């Protein structure tokens, strides 16, 4: 059965069940499919080709409905968050060449010009009062059809689209449902941007089991006061987020089992879980089931998991990333973690060169080069040992350092750029340091800070805010190693000044 049909079966049985709760409004499964039906009709009226559809919006009800409606009409969806910089959105649109663009937010003039032939969606009273519609699932995505395409950081400065099939998503959803979604009337945190693959941890397992998505707005995730207020008046049973987001919430003294007795499960992914964070969370929620999971976007969500216990933390210097889920074979080749099996995505959308570099086959099965160093113990436990290339996780987001470098080097007065991660004793990336080769001279620190401010303003037009370097270091010439290459280790020792 197709995922959409599974969700629709729940809507037929319990149409008034809450599917998603925003800060000010709650929506039912009936209303979800009324909106899906309405949007799918608008898509159908366009007589589109079968290329993907770009959806520009926020983490909200209407954007979720647009994603499902797109799949209902047989299209993959490309989620792009409304706060994505214009130039980056333009690059994604240019690379994807979507059949159409759906927008669920008000647009500024430049975005209106970019999305000239868009389908503008809004939530109307008619949609919310409609009865549960009869839907035709014959054209809905299935099998190896592409379900969604998420654009991630690319080494050349141009984002690349990870193409995930319906079968990939079914495999992931079934695993999540079998292992984690056994809580009755499950209320599941939906914090990750829809354009970030961590979002599928919440979306599809919740929708296919009759759960309720507790959706946090950007205002709430970026304003601690609003965030803590919302959490303290909201019942959540299953928590899904990056470890960094947990770190933020642990700053609130009331984020404890005593104040949140219904919060019984944590599923963490998106970046390395440090021992300090794991220990703090175990102390705050001693009775909860806490899981560390691992998996790149190219392997559909996560492919391994392990329950966090005091014993596990005592026995390991770094928190292990777990045992492989069914259908996944993990291998270590030249110290690199290789993922083999039915979770591996189709490749990078219409980018055969990048696909060939990262995707291959092992014994006839799809495989992916993660770029992560790791080891597997005799009992099958996978351990993460850092990146083997220039890709890092910072605040839960996967970032290609060369993406930032390429965009900086496009700026005036900058000859070369190297971006390096700064880590703490827990191996967690705490900052991104940009080293810039430039002939620019500064009369004083004030002049340097002013130049940095201008540089950041220009850079913010082409990279996401979470990719912005924390500090900028200016050099006349980069040090070189014996091979004539930039000596990154020497650069790391040259960090100076505050910006």
From Swiss-Prot:
Gene it is expressed from: dltA
Gene3D superfamilies assigned: 3.30.300.30, N-terminal domain of ligase-like
Pathway(s) annotated for this protein in UniProt: Cell wall biogenesis; lipoteichoic acid biosynthesis
Annotated organism of origin: Lactococcus lactis subsp. lactis (strain IL1403)
Any GO MF annotation of the entry: D-alanine [D-alanyl carrier protein] ligase activity
Full protein name: D-alanine--D-alanyl carrier protein ligase
NCBIfam families in the cross-refs: D-ala-DACP-lig, PRK04813.1
Residues that, per the record, bind D-alanine: 197, 485
Entry's EC annotation: 6.2.1.54
Cited function: Catalyzes the first step in the D-alanylation of lipoteichoic acid (LTA), the activation of D-alanine and its transfer onto the D-alanyl carrier protein (Dcp) DltC. In an ATP-dependent two-step reaction, forms a high energy D-alanyl-AMP intermediate, followed by transfer of the D-alanyl residue as a thiol ester to the phosphopantheinyl prosthetic group of the Dcp. D-alanylation of LTA plays an important role in modulating the properties of the cell wall in Gram-positive bacteria, influencing the net charge of the cell wall.
GO annotation terms (biological process): lipoteichoic acid biosynthetic process
